[in-house]
Every structure is written in C-alpha cells, then in structure tokens.
Amino acid sequence: VLAYDPQRRGQQREGGPMTVQSKAPAAGGGEPPEGRVGRRAGISAKTLRTDRWWIQPVVTFAVLFSFIIYSTWAAFIDRDYFSEPYISPFYSPCLAIKCGTVPGSKGVPHLGIFGHWWFTSPAIIILIVPLGFRMTCYYYRKAYYRSFWLSPPACAVAEPHAKYTGETRFPLIIQNIHRYFFYLGILLNLILTYDAVIAFRNHHGAWGHAGLGTLVLVLNAVFLWSYTASCHSCRSIIGGRLNHFSKHPVRYWMWGQVSRLNRYHMQIAWISLLWVAFSDVYVRLVASGTITDVRFF
C-alpha cells in the first residue's frame, strides 16, 4: 500500500507525469541489461505449488485407464450380457442377429440390422456413441488432457510440451462434433430408459415385478439423463441464440434449471461413468450364473 504524499503530488504536477520503472532481476541474477526493464524473473522450478497437486491427475488417470481396460474387455468378450429381463447397457440396443446365439444372451431382443455377416461383438457398434459423447465432453477433455497428456497437469504447473496449439488442428479439432454426439446420446438414453422400464418384468415376461437388477438399470438411466442434462452443450442449446430472456420465459426457466445442474457436471460425470460399468458387471454376473438376482416382488 502506498501512502499519500501531497508534496510528491505537487512535484509530479510541476515536473509533469512521474515515470516509475521497476527493474526485475535477470534470469541469471543481478541487474537486467540496459533497455530490458520489467522482465520477469527466470524460475527453473516446475511449479511453486507446495500442495499435493499431482494427486488429482494421478487418480483421474487411474480411474479412466481402468474403465478403458474394463469396457474394452467387456465389449470384445461377446457373452453374458443378457438375463431376462436385464440387458447390459454396453450391448443395448443389440443390432446384430448373432446377439442371441452366444452364451449368456439367449433370448435377447435384437433389431437385426446387422445380419449374420457381422462377425465381431455387437457392442462395438453401440459403444461408438457413448465413447464419442464422453471423449468430446468439455469436462472429460480437461480430465484427460491433464492426466494423460499433462497439458497442463494442474493449475500453475508447467507442462512438458514446447508449444500449444489448442484444438485448432487435427485431430483435436474433431472435438467440435460434441454437440452432434449430444443428440445421439439422447437417443441412446431413451433406449436405456426403455430397458429400465421393461426390467419391471420377471423372467417369464409378466409385468409388476422388480429385482435388484431393476434398481440398477433404473439408476443407470437416471444418472445418464442427469449427465446429459448437465452437459454444457445442453445448457447452450436451451439458452443460446436468445437476445432477450424476457421474451422466452419458458426457455429462461429451463436454462436456469440446467445451469444449476451444470454446477455438478463433474460429479455427475464420474457417477454415471462408474455406474454404467457397475450395471454391466451386475448383468454379467447374473447372466453367467455367478450370482442370483435378488427379487423384491
């Protein structure tokens, strides 16, 4: 804080504007060369942070990497993903005729769009949508940029890359298709909601029944809808392209609700990611006969 000095103010008024030059020390110490005033000090340390800033990127890397390994295995194993009336979210909707011909999938409903010529797991077709939606998500981009690419690993921590081009070049410029995956994500959510509804049947197809698997699939649909609704693209679509909110009270109200949900987008992103994996695990254990579904009524 600078104290007010009336005499100094008078000197400034008589002699014209007062010029203050701050001479920062050069990178090697000592006074900077003449003509290079105001240069920042050279700091060789990677960061001046003293907290455990590395914990978050390490945990993020571990969780995302584990999910990638498991989801890849679950997609290619091509079995044990259906037990009436439960179907794994990794395999829904089943688009290939071969869906009902592998162990642990007898009787699974399929659309048959891909005929007998489809030789690999039908999950490969479906997982493109949730994978593309989450990979281009604004929060997940931040998460894996920091944890996998260290760009940067944390706030106020230097990154190892020599230059930064952002998302203006291939392949990162593809991130701009996030909004289109948003619409596909809504379609997939509708299908998974249908799976949750038909889970209120027993293995004979009679309605009015529920088990632990029903609760698992219902919560999976709720978490996925919450993740989609809290998405930044959803908030932009609802409240964007409006010059006056007062002329659109309904959209303004919807935008306000989505904005409140958007505050928890990070937490919802993790909950929905882990729960969809848990949903697959539960259905897989029931379909393989490892456990028996707990029936409520």
Give each language-model segment a name.
Residues 4-5, 19-297:
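Membrane-embedded alpha-helical bundles that constitute the cytochrome b-like, heme-associated redox core
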